[in-house]
């Protein structure tokens, strides 16, 4: 059995115990108590699957947490603040652009747009977004630029459907890339997108997609809204 699986279960058991003590003092609100009940059922199921006693695991989890807290400084207990990363200038973000062959698709709370008239170009993706815990938190805007600076694609959040995950953004990037590469464009991404929004690119920043995936993604973006 993986040691991380065991220690994770042990810590979860102890933290549940702490939350239970908090609830016993009638300090928890309704959502807190609801999560407590659901997590209790989950821990019982995990304990049965792992063949571990919950009481024993709780004691072991307490030792792990105490050891961590002994090494923790007050500074480390502060909640990390979001960082705002910018590939684009204000002018690049606010510039109007037009499509000769407009295509767009709504994927969850994100809108993907591209000009399918663009062919045989080298295209760079740039984005402005916030990051927390070294992961993308909120996409502000992503745009695709030709080497000449023309905007040929875009991914933006829909104001009417707030909320998206890093995985949502990654999937949307895949759809945009697939559509652009279908027309024999070479697509590269900025370093910030590579690091926080698309972790599978190669050293040149190109987003390698096999031909069958390109075709699938190109078909996906065919539906106009």
UniProtKB/Swiss-Prot annotation:
**Gene Ontology CC:** host cell cytoplasm; host cell nucleus
Question: Which residues does the annotated region (PABPN1-binding) include?
Answer: 218-225
Q: Which residues form a coiled coil?
A: none
Q: Which InterPro entries does the UniProt record give?
A: NS1, NS1A, NS1A_effect_dom-like_sf, uS15_NS1_RNA-bd_sf
Which parts of the sequence are annotated with region: CPSF4-binding?
A: 175-210
Q: Where is this region: RNA-binding and homodimerization?
A: 1-73
Q: Which Pfam families match?
A: Flu_NS1
- Keyword Ubl conjugation tagged: yes
Q: What span is annotated as the signal peptide, if there is one? A: none
* Record's keyword terms, sorted: Eukaryotic host gene expression shutoff by virus, Host cytoplasm, Host gene expression shutoff by virus, Host mRNA suppression by virus, Host nucleus, Host-virus interaction, Inhibition of host innate immune response by virus, Inhibition of host interferon signaling pathway by virus, Inhibition of host PKR by virus, Inhibition of host pre-mRNA processing by virus, Inhibition of host RIG-I by virus, Inhibition of host RLR pathway by virus, Interferon antiviral system evasion, RNA-binding, Ubl conjugation, Viral immunoevasion
Where is this protein localized, as stated in its record? Host nucleus; Host cytoplasm
* Motif Nuclear export signal per record, residues: 132-141
HAMAP family to which the protein is assigned, alphabetical: INFV_NS1
* Primary role: Inhibits post-transcriptional processing of cellular pre-mRNA, by binding and inhibiting two cellular proteins that are required for the 3'-end processing of cellular pre-mRNAs: the 30 kDa cleavage and polyadenylation specificity factor/CPSF4 and the poly(A)-binding protein 2/PABPN1. In turn, unprocessed 3' end pre-mRNAs accumulate in the host nucleus and are no longer exported to the cytoplasm. Cellular protein synthesis is thereby shut off very early after virus infection.
Name under which the protein is recorded = Non-structural protein 1
Question: From what organism does this protein derive?
Answer: Influenza A virus (strain A/Hong Kong/212/2003 H5N1 genotype Z+)
């Amino acid at each position: 059995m993986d040691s991380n699986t065991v220690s994770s279960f042990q810590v979860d058991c102890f933290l549940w115990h702490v939350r239970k003590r908090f609830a016993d003092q009638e300090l928890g609100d309704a959502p807190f108590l609801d999560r407590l009940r659901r997590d209790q059922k989950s821990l019982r199921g995990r304990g049965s699957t792992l063949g571990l006693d919950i009481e024993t695991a709780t004691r072991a989890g307490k030792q792990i947490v105490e050891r961590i807290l002994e090494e923790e400084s007050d500074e480390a207990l502060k909640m990390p603040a979001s960082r705002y990363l910018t590939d684009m200038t204000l002018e690049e973000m606010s510039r109007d652009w037009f499509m000769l062959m407009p295509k767009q698709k709504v994927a969850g709370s994100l809108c993907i747009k591209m000009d399918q008239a663009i062919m045989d170009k080298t295209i760079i993706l740039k984005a402005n977004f916030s990051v927390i815990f070294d992961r993308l938190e909120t996409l502000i805007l992503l745009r695709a630029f030709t080497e000449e600076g023309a905007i040929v694609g875009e991914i933006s959040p829909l104001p009417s459907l707030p909320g998206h995950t890093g995985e949502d953004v990654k999937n949307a990037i895949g759809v945009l890339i697939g559509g652009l590469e279908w027309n024999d464009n070479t697509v590269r991404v900025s370093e910030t997108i590579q690091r926080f929004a698309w972790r599978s690119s190669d050293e040149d920043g190109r987003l390698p997609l096999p031909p069958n995936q390109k075709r699938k993604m190109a078909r996906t973006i065919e539906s106009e809204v």
